[in-house]
Amino acid sequence: MSSFAIAEKVVDIFPSTETTAPIIYLNTFSGEGQKIYEAARAANYPQFTLVAISDLGWNHDMVPWDSPSAFKNADPFTGGADDYLRLLTEEIIPTAEKEIKGVPSWRGILGYSLAGLFALYAIYQTDLFSRVGSMSGSLWFPGMKEYIFSHETKCRPDCMYFSLGDKESKTRNPLLRSVRQNTEEIQAFYQGKGIDTGFQLNPGNHYNHAVERTAAGICWLLSR
């Protein structure tokens, strides 16, 4: 593993020894990149390089526009995804890919929770990613489903993976209650366009087995 820092973000690279191995970009909540990498590698799927970014402004960097907080006494969302995506595409990706040997066969982006929301938003702004994973993605976020249905991606993804805990929508919170319906409708929307999509409903709530669920998303993308 090697690491570097850009604009107060910490970037950890878990490299493959294969020169054409795909590269996957993962935005993390609390620096869980190594655990996710080890869990995915243990599953004996094809080799890959993981680039995990941490120290993010979670409620700013991962969201596309401003929105009130989804929780009582929590900070509001302040849309900083465009600025962070510019940092990712113009600085983080070029720096990371100078550190690895060879040229990746494909480039993917995925994330959990708000990072899953960001992964989807990213493909509407850049054509750098051909595979996408949104695990327990915050697809309840106000306006996101409508944005997806009314805009075109910058390039057609090769495949897209979605997963959700089966208890995530069972809440009194009216925003979060929509997450399963929104996720299923969004997955069906992409599937209807002929894109290879997967949807996995896992037992548990939003906070159960995040590492394992994220690793499962990586493995699904690698299996296509």
Residue ranges and their predicted role:
Residues 10, 20-99:
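Serine-hydrolase catalytic machinery in alpha/beta-hydrolase-like enzymes
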Residues 106-111, 135:
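Short beta-strand immediately N-terminal to the catalytic nucleophile in serine-hydrolase-like folds
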Residues 110-115, 119:
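Gly/Ala-rich beta-loop-alpha elbow adjacent to hydrolase catalytic centers
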Residues 139-221:
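The feature captures the conserved acid-bearing segment of alpha/beta-hydrolase catalytic domains
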